[in-house]
Structure formats: C-alpha cells, structure tokens
Amino acid sequence: MPDNKNNIDLVNVQVDGHWIKVKKGTRMIEACKQAEAEVPHYCYHPKLTSPGNCRMCLVEMGMPPRPAPGEVIETDDDGHANISWMPRPVIACANTVAEGMGIRTQSTLAKECREGVMEFLLINHPLDCPICDQAGECTLQEYSVEHGKGESRFLEQKVKKPKNVKIGPRIRLDDERCVLCSRCVRFSKEIVDDDVLGFVDRGSHNVLTVHPDKPLANNYSLNTVDICPVGALTSNDFRFQMRVWFMRETKSICTGCARGCNILISSRENKIYRQTPRENNEVNSAWMCDSGRMHYHTLEAKRRLTDPMIKRGKGHEVIDWPTAILKATKGLSKFSGEEIAIIGSAGMTNEELFLLKTLSSTLNAGIVDVVKVEGEGDEYLSHKDKRPNTNGAKAILKLRNPGSKINTIKKRIKDGEIKALLVYGENVIKHGIDQETLKNLKFLVCSHIQANSLAEFSNVILPGSGYAEKRGSMINATGRLQVLNKAIEPPGQSREDWEILQDLNRSLDGKDQITEIADLFSEMANQVPILKQKTLSSIGDLGVNVVETGETVPLLEREAKRVREGLIVG
C-alpha cells in the first residue's frame, strides 16, 4: 500500500529528452533542477513567492495530446505518450508539472528567449563590473556570458538612475544595476513583515525605492543584499573591502545567540570580511539577523588580549605561557575546594566546558556555574538567550538553572568564604559581581579575549580565542548539536581555549593530555549521555538533534505553513 500511495504522488516528466519521476505539484524549475538541467533565473527564490517577472526562466513545454474516442495514442520507446509541443514558451518558476509533461531547456526557442531577455536587461545596465562588489558572484555577469548575444545592438543613450542611495543604516542602493527582480521587496514583506520597499515610475524608468518615512532598518535587512542577484544592493560593512574570489569560506555557526544560525565566514590573510547565512532548514532556513552577521567585529576590538599576563603592583606584566599556567594553578591550589569558585560561559564550546568540569573536579571547587545573559528576541530567528551553548552547559556541567548560583558566589565572596575565583569567557562585573565584591578575593584568574574591567582585577590573565578562531561543538536552543569551525588564527600569543584548559589540567594532575579536538570530543561523548556514539565528524555540516527542548523556530513554522499552502517551495 505505501508504494502505491507514493506512486500516486509522483508524475512522469520528460526533461530534455530524459524521463524522471517527480512529486506532483513540483514547479517546473525544481523538476529541471532534479534532472540536472539548469534553468537561469533572477526573480525566483525557493523561500519566496514566484512573481514570474524576470522571464529569464522561459522554457519550451509540451503535453500528450488528448485522444479522440477510439484513437490510439502513439508512444515512444519508453512507453510514454508522444508529446505535442506548445508554440510559445512558459515560465518554469510559477508553473507546476503534470503527468506526461515535456520540458525543453536547451531548445532553439528557449535559447532565443534567454538571449532576448538578457539583451533587454543589459540595455541600460552600467558597465560597473570592475568596481561592483557583486563581481564574481553576479548572476547577470554569469548569464550574460552563458546566455547573452555576445554583442550589443543598442546605440541610444542609456537611462540614468539614482546611484549610491542610502536606503537604510546598513545598505546602499544603485538603481542603475537593479534588474527589477523584486526579491528584496518580497523578502521584506513576506519574511520580516517590513513592507518598506517597492517600485515606482514606469517602463525603463522603473526604479526600486524605499518608503519616504521609513528606511530599510529591520534587523534582517542585510539578507536583501544576499539574495540580490546583481550589485544593486550592497552592504556598507563589506562595500569595497575585498574581492570575493580572494576570500576563503569556512562553514560554521553564529554565536550571537542560542539560535545557532548556520553561516559562512569569509576571510583572507587571517582577517574576516563578512559573514553570510548558510542554508539549514532545521535551524535558520536561508537567513540570519544583522546583529549576528556583524558579530565578527567583536574579534577586532582594539582592547584585544594577545599575551598572558600576571599582576605586578598596580599594573600587569607580560609573561610566557608556561609561567602563566604555573602561576594560575599554584595560586588556585593554595585554597581548599570550598574556597574556590569557577564561573564559565555558555558561550564556551562543549569541549571547553568538559575540560572546565574536569578542572573543577581536580580542584574540588565548591561551586561552578555559568553566566546567564538574556536580551530581546523576536518572532523570526533572534533568541532572547544571548549565549549560544546554554544547553551544552546544562548537559555537561549538569546545571538545572544556569546562572542561578552567581548571587550565591557573590555573597560568599563578600563573606570571605570564597577566596579564589576562576572566570572563563565572561566579564562578571557586567553580570552581577561588582568590583567592590571582587576586592575581597585573594586570587583571581580570568580568561577572555578582551582587556575589560575584570582583567584589571585579575592576578593572572589568560588570553583566549574567539568563536571564529577555534573548533568545537555547541547545542542550540532547540537541542541541535552543531560544529563550530576555525576560520582564522588567534592574534598574538593568545591560544585556543581548550588548549589552555588542557594545560591547566596537566599542571594540576600531571597526566598526558589529548592533542586533537576530535579525540577530546570522543572522550567527552563517552561521559555525557546525550552525546553517546557521536563523533565530531559525524555531526556533519547541518548538525544533529540530541536534546528535546520543546522549543521551535518561529520563522521555520511560518515557512512550513507557506509551503503547505503552496506559496513557496521552501
């Protein structure tokens, strides 16, 4: 029975002479994609509705003729009815397949249609390729080579349109480059409910514009730059910074909040130039928020810690790593377990949290917790939990309510019960433990990436690494285990945090430590139930669910509803 049902849901479609089976209701452009037949397009995007206004996806379409009573239908060698081809092309993005349908993407008619569309698009398009940020990833550039005529017949004066227009705090518009695909208009209206973009004027004078009283300022505005097929919309942050073909792309995850959006980090010569969303239909679809996109700037802070230091008088002195590790462990070892507290961060990777737990066991630390940081979330992707690995901290450190012990630690420091404190990855002065309280400590060790107010109080400073400077794993708000990958090296003498924690443990127990992060994950997986039988490589680029949190992603729920309604492909 299941096989029969599946067969009912499938239809036979011929694409460029080859028969394939596709799901009933599939759009022609997606059927061609399954058949590995490219159909060029500008306005079509699987996450948005299809207006069919660019006409670049025109293909030749045919259907079997309807037989007259008693007439025998002629069939081909495969047993399928012969196809009668329509004299006019159809758009592949907005039409769905039917049983016996034929599609030609490489016929003379289809090729002539594409050439004609390309010629119209290029009539008034400026020759900006040498200075355009989209060069190298511009579909107009690519299609003009693959589907264009090769020369222009246009001799008249090109229409001039507005250039370098500020339409929002993060975006510039060049109307001369716009091909009127309306992707940005539909994204703003359909995905983030911010209907501020539209077209005005007519014919060749048609231009994209923003509402006069409301700029494009929502927290997802830079997604319009990603989906713009040309260089009409550019990011102020990336504009004129680097050519795309010089950059290396690293698959990773955003650590700006607990959502864990999948991203591509684009870097060159140990510098990050941009972050863009990477599609994952279980986490962030194909989008990400602007604040997460700009999160990489936290790694460029002028007050970045680059060398280990110890306190000397009123200041700090740079030392080497072996001395720093020894000073930290000797200082902590002077106190009993009940006199030691450890505060970690829910921004640490699972591997780092595992080593922090090992360290706390070795020191017999009386109290261990992580800082809880909450802010504003929204009904799309941004999560109110502003730390990416709270679920990892719960599972590995066995915390029921992360952050609940911070006030207890503060009180016990004031009372003189806690005399030594190790703070990893957080500035606790901003999160509940004030400077006056810290003055009661006998010994303070901190590891951070920035020279903040906490570092000024510390006896030993251990410069760590940012999220793009290390490899590891995290568990997001919905319980999905994902991999964080290293895109650049930590600056100066700063090191990956798991290596620092390894050295602290080795200094205390004298045991040989693991040298590879993958081996560390395997050791952790043997001790953490939710990670059993997992390896770092088995997680893959899209992650795997390991915890049932009951949370859902609002944007994905809305997207699923639109897919069911047939509005988008998804």
Where are these regions (language model features)?
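Short, contiguous acidic and Ser/Thr-rich linear segments
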Residues: 19-26
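Catalytic alpha/large subunits of respiratory electron-transfer oxidoreductases
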Residues: 122, 126, 174, 181, ...
